[in-house]
UniProtKB/Swiss-Prot annotation:
SUPFAM superfamilies: Globin-like. Keywords: Heme, Iron, Metal-binding, Oxygen transport, Transport. PROSITE patterns: GLOBIN (PS01033). The gene is HBA. The keyword Transcription does not apply. Disulfide bonds: none annotated. Pfam families: Globin (PF00042). Involved in oxygen transport from gills to the various peripheral tissues. Red blood cells. One of its GO terms (biological process) is hydrogen peroxide catabolic process. GO terms for cellular component: blood microparticle; haptoglobin-hemoglobin complex; hemoglobin complex. Heterotetramer of two alpha chains and two beta chains. It comes from Bathyraja eatonii (Eaton's skate). This is Hemoglobin subunit alpha. The lineage of its organism: Eukaryota, Metazoa, Chordata, Craniata, Vertebrata. InterPro entries: Globin, Globin-like_sf, Globin/Proto, Hemoglobin_a-typ, Hemoglobin_oxygen_transport.
Length: 142
């Protein structure tokens, strides 16, 4: 992954903006994923609902966004930082890796709706970051 210093600055700026709102951003993104790609609900059979206001959606959305925020702190060593998570997804959870692509696109849309300063440069930086994150999470699939 080639992230310029400007890209890294944009990523860190967005991370700081959304950190206090991780639960709301995550819940919104996850609810969008369920609405646009209902087949993804099969990975969450214990959820009683799939809306942003439902407690399980809030909790899992926060978990995902907090993991993304943590990854943003490790831009220079993403493969090492994400190795355990990639192994868990690739060998234990067995989530179709294409869902990472779907969810990363939805995260971008969610950020664009939440952040008035989401510029084309911000979009480019976040897109590059999430593309690498998806690549790393998919790296342990056989």
């Amino acid at each position: 992954m080639v992230l310029s210093d400007a890209n890294k600055q944009e990523i860190h700026h967005v991370a700081e903006l959304i950190k206090p709102h991780a639960e709301a951003v995550g819940a919104d993104a996850l609810a969008r994923l369920f609405e646009l790609h209902p087949q993804t609900k099969t990975y969450f059979p214990n959820f009683s609902g799939y809306h942003a206001t439902d407690a399980p959606v809030k909790a899992h959305g926060a978990k995902v966004i907090n993991a993304v925020l943590k990854a943003a702190e490790h831009l220079d060593d993403l493969p090492k930082h994400l190795e355990k998570l990639a192994t868990k997804h690739g060998h234990e959870l067995l989530v179709d890796p294409h869902n990472f692509v779907l969810f990363s696109d939805i995260i971008v849309v969610t950020l664009a709706t939440k952040l008035p300063t989401f510029s084309p440069a911000t979009h480019r930086a976040i897109d590059k970051f999430l593309e690498e994150l998806v690549h790393q999470l998919s790296s342990k699939y056989r």
